[in-house]
Amino acid sequence: MNFSPAWLILLKLALALIGACFTRQPMNAKMRARAPGAFIRVTDGLIHYQWHGPLEGPIIVLVHGLTTPSFIWRDQIPALVRAGYRVLTFDHFGRGYSDRPSKRQDLELFISELDEIMKTLQVRKSYHLLGYSMGGGVVTKFTSLRRDQICKLVLIAPIGFLKGQPNWMARWPLAGNLAMFVFGGWIMHRGAKKAALAEGVDSKMVALQLRETKYAGYFSAVLSSIRHTIYTDMRDAHRILKERNVSILAIFGEEDSVIPQNTAKLLSEVNNTAQIVKIKGAGHGLVTTHSRQINEAILRFLHE
């Protein structure tokens, strides 16, 4: 029997869909048994978190970005702990060991998530916030709404000034959902390998990043975040932070292909009190590839 090219394409798509259905693992109690740290229950589900460092140290909360959960802070945590800080890390919904609620992943969700984490863990004293990529947008908006407990704000390659539109998968709900479900693993593998080759992200970090693609709910969370968070304009939030005299450090990689090169300039135009640091030769994976420069800049800023 001869099959037309169209039928062969449909057959391959069907096989890919079946494969995706049967290879994604649920994030359940069995999977969480291997997790370091602990869990808390908030309104939308379980959140995986970890405390690091001395109990009485000044607190800094690290908020990760779009695709890589809290293990992205592998190279920042030791430096902060050695400097005496009490470090809190956690996984956003849909990533790491946290739950996968079927909710729109917009700023409202992420702000509620962070707010409930701090309240549930009973963090009553002031703290610093550090956000990377999408996490930079989350902490910017969060701080503009809740200034009272936040001392200083560190942004690493933050969103908030992206122009244009998301890709077709984010714009077309049904087709995009299906494409992300079927081909998301391939897309992530290609992106991770590209980062390893172009930026020098090490193989251990790449392996951890690709492990995320094996879990159910991960791709839908990422796609929803692209649709509803990544392209959010943060200029008004930054204006509020300037009015309130919030101390801000913003770090950018000079070779970042994800966050546009003019972002530092745009941020400075809105808030000329923000300190800007540009790291030569660094791409979007700078927290891993240029951790020494990142850590030095963070600690210098926090100690001022």
Give residue ranges: language-model regions.
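Catalytic histidine-centered segment of alpha/beta-hydrolase-like enzymes
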Residues: A282-S291, N295
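Flexible "cap/lid" loop of the alpha/beta hydrolase fold
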Residues: S144, C151-F181
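Acidic catalytic loop of the alpha/beta-hydrolase fold
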Residues: E255-I259, H284-G285
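Short beta-strand/loop motif that positions the catalytic acidic residue
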Residues: R244, A250-F252, D256
